[in-house]
């Protein structure tokens, strides 16, 4: 299973590194090109994915099912972080392509009850916050794509963990953009700026799950 995880990590790293970021930004669609792999900043993708994979192996050395579930969840959030930063968009087909094998391994490892409860909790909790923010403030506290990502985390963990990850992500994002506002000082521009939340969700996920 660890060998499969290594192969999967390698191909996801190639996929992320081959994404045409300019095309993604302009068209909000994913286009891959072998030429992009050569760009120097893709070394960051390799370093992050490689070391997280190694840490997951050490963390779940005696449970390869939990290893592959957590690896799939991490890789999905990582891809979504890239698309969220570049075009402020989360692609549902990417979420589903990782959710299906996560469900399979949850059934295989007999974690399905915990994962389903975590999934439902993530959808209900953040769905209610999303709806209430639209009703009372006329704006979204976060996007539907963020709910997809948090629901995937719920499917991979449990209700308590997904709640803490979401809360920590909001706090970190709030601090980051407060500091940014201090330097920008343009309130109108800042108020209408879309905030990519998934990178903060990824950061919170790595901190709260693995450290």
PLM regions: where:
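A membrane-topology feature that recognizes alpha-helical transmembrane segments
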Residues: 1-211
């Amino acid at each position: 299973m660890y060998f499969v995880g290594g192969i999967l990590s390698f191909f996801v790293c190639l996929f992320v590194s081959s994404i045409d970021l300019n095309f993604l930004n302009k068209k909000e669609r994913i286009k891959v090109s072998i030429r992009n792999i050569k760009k120097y900043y893709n070394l960051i993708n390799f370093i992050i994915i490689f070391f997280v994979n190694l840490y997951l192996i050490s963390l779940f050395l005696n449970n390869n099912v939990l290893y592959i579930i957590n690896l799939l969840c991490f890789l999905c959030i990582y891809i979504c972080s890239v698309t969220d930063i570049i075009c402020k968009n989360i692609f549902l087909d990417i979420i589903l392509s990782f959710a299906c094998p996560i469900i399979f391994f949850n059934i295989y490892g007999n974690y399905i009850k915990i994962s389903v409860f975590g999934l439902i909790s993530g959808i209900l909790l953040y769905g209610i916050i999303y709806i209430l923010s639209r009703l009372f403030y006329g704006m979204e506290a976060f996007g539907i794509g963020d709910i997809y990502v948090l629901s995937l985390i719920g499917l991979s963990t449990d209700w308590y963990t997904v709640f803490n990850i979401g809360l920590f992500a909001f706090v970190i994002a709030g601090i980051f953009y407060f500091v940014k506002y201090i330097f920008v000082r343009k309130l109108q521009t800042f108020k209408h700026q879309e905030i990519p939340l998934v990178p903060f969700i990824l950061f919170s996920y790595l901190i709260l799950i693995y450290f």
